[in-house]
């Protein structure tokens, strides 16, 4: 199977020559790297050998269903979560501003917009700031692979809206400019959107509110009636546990995950998914002619990118339908949920973990829907440690969102939430060796090549490459975090930066300070060297026991290991999985079953 990936292009860009940027973080250092050069690195796989047929390149689609099977799974899920009895009682026009919630199912903001209006106008703003440079080191904020995944999510969202009587209005520009303008044209009384938690997203919310306050809507009645502008209603909808239901204020959130988990498991219940009306239409009947119609979803070329082909690793299909198809495939067709806890630390293939994280990050998949499907599976098939562990991972995902609210911008700072003072290197040459998979340690190099080729890496791999960068190389952890921001399909600021602070020993939990031994990890999780040989074809001809320890048969090791080759990581067997969110250094022993 041939998969499509994207690399940078010299074609004319969809964006202005000077991209606007956010200013809510401390002043950055000058960019270390050229933006276009890095975009090409993100998605330019090196040539692959084909010597060993068993390790020959193969691309796995996720979900691995046919198009008809995906649609059937999606239709079945929507059928169970739609209600013909829902009634709307509102008037006028409401705008539904889609952000990181690119789905119809269990989208409270969308249902509330529908109920409070006679017609809903769905809007997505292609914000150029999200395609600029990262704050400290000037990497691309959105790499080519995630840009393509986003395009697919938007295309799928548009199709699903059209099936239910609506469409998707797509505009390029800042939401604080676009939404007030559209609200004025359509006389929209309210803009509904999902609430976010991190600084850049919160800044946009403030700017949108300020812009809407400048809009004067036409009023009936007497001439001295007070003018009213459109309201902004932000709805919580990104976590499994609702923020209003957790037994702490964000200010008093525990800094130890286990304390948080035990409290929510014992004191909180998870709300049910919001039912969806059978029809969401009609759209507004006037105003579209004044704004040149619905607009179009940008192509990769318009984003300054082009596509190329690769035949290795995993290829994710974006969109809500694909997400629902993946749940159907993993839980019900392949029956893999029952063994998830035993397989979650794998590194090869599509099915060692759920692979839900890219859809969760884009909001194409509701965590509450996953919860409901786990409970349904437990009733119909089996309830065991594996079914619990998927929920355990979703609680971690929730925790990082709430932690980002408690600690704010400190999760992006060098010293982290605890303001830990440490000496870090920003050696460009060393970092590039890690980034490009040229460290001389096959397990590190293979993982980094998988990341740049596919936009994905196993949780085990994320733990290992993070530990190596910050512990063995002594490199500023923010360089690693920003490179992950560039590459990952499942990038989410709260989880990404929360986890990197943990890995660097500067996170909110003072007990989180661990080292992962590369030899130990290789022997435990890639004992026959299949993973490294898959991504590093020059190792395929070596005996299996030498693939992770090739000596002079491989490139020179760029740094010595901090604890040599005999150190055993006492935490190696307890790493958490990436299955439900973009993790890399998350961990915790299961304490009690839900």
Name these PLM-found stretches.
Residues 393-443, 449, 459-463:
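Active-site core of glycosidic bond-cleaving carbohydrate-active enzymes
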Residues 339, 402, 459-460, 476-481, ...:
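Acidic/polar loop patches that form or flank catalytic/metal-binding clefts of enzymes
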Residues 2-280, 449-450, 495-496, 578-594:
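Trp/Phe/Arg-rich N-terminal binding region typifying the photolyase-homology
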Residues 418-425, 431, 435, 472-474, ...:
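C-terminal, helix-dominated tail/subdomain
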Residues 2, 14, 25, 32-33, ...:
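Glycine/tryptophan-enriched, flexible segments
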Residues 190-193, 456-477:
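Hydrophobic/aromatic-rich, well-ordered segments within soluble, folded domains that form packed cores
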Residues 123-127, 354-358, 369, 389, ...:
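Contiguous, well-ordered alpha-helical segments that form the cores/surfaces of helical PPI scaffolds
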């Amino acid at each position: 199977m041939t998969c499509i990936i994207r690399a940078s292009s010299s074609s004319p860009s969809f964006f202005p020559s000077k991209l606007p940027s956010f200013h809510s973080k401390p002043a950055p250092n000058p960019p270390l790297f050229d933006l276009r050069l890095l975009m090409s690195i993100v998605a330019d796989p090196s040539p692959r050998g084909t010597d060993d047929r068993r390790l020959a390149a193969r691309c796995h689609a996720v979900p691995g269903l046919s198009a008809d099977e995906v649609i059937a799974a999606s239709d079945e899920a929507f059928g169970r979560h739609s209600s013909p009895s829902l009634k709307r009682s509102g008037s006028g026009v409401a705008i539904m501003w889609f952000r990181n919630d690119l789905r119809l199912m269990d989208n409270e903001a969308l249902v509330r917009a529908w109920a409070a209006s006679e017609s809903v106008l769905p809007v997505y703003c292609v914000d150029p700031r999200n395609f600029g440079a990262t704050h400290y080191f000037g990497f691309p904020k959105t790499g080519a692979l995630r840009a393509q995944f986003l395009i697919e999510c938007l295309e799928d969202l548009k199709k699903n809206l059209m099936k239910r009587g609506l469409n998707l209005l797509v505009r390029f520009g800042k939401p604080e400019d676009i939404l007030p303008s559209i609200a004025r044209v359509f006389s929209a009384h309210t803009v509904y959107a999902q609430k976010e938690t991190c600084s850049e997203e919160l800044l946009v919310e403030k700017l949108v509110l300020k812009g809407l306050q400048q809009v004067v809507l036409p009023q009936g009645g007497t001439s001295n009636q007070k003018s009213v502008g459109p309201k902004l209603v932000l709805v919580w909808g990104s976590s499994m546990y609702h923020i209003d239901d957790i037994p702490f204020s964000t200010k008093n959130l525990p800094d130890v995950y286990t304390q948080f988990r035990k409290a929510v498991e014992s004191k909180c219940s998870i709300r049910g998914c919001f039912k969806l009306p059978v029809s969401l239409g009609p759209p507004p009947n006037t105003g579209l002619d004044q704004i040149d119609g619905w607009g179009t979803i940008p192509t990769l070329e318009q984003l300054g990118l082009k596509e190329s082909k690769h035949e290795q690793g995993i290829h994710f299909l974006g969109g809500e339908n694909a997400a629902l198809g993946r749940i159907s495939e993993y839980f019900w067709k392949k029956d893999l949920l029952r063994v998830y806890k035993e397989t979650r630390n794998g590194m090869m293939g599509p099915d060692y973990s759920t692979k839900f994280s890219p859809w969760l990050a884009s909001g194409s998949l509701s965590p509450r829907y996953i919860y409901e499907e786990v409970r349904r599976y437990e009733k119909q098939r089996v309830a065991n440690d594996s079914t619990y562990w998927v929920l355990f991972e979703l609680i971690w995902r929730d925790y990082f969102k709430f932690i980002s609210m408690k600690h704010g911008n400190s999760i992006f700072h060098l010293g982290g939430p605890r303001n830990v003072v440490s000496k870090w290197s920003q050696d460009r040459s060393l970092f590039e060796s890690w980034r490009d998979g040229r460290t001389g340690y096959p397990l590190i190099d293979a993982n980094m090549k998988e990341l740049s080729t596919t936009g994905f890496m196993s949780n085990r791999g994320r733990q290992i490459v993070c530990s190596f960068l910050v512990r063995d190389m002594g490199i500023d952890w923010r360089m690693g975090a920003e490179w992950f921001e560039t590459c990952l399909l499942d990038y989410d600021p709260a989880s990404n930066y929360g986890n990197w602070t943990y890995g660097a020993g500067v996170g909110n939990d003072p007990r989180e300070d661990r080292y992962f031994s590369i030899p130990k990890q290789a022997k435990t999780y890639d004992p026959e060297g299949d993973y490294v040989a898959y991504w590093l074809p020059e190792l395929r001809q070596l005996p299996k026991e030498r693939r992770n320890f090739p000596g002079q048969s491989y490139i020179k090791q760029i740094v010595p290991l901090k604890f040599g080759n005999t150190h055993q990581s006492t935490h190696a067997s307890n790493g958490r999985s990436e299955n439900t969110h973009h993790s890399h250094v998350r961990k915790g022993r299961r304490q009690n079953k839900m």
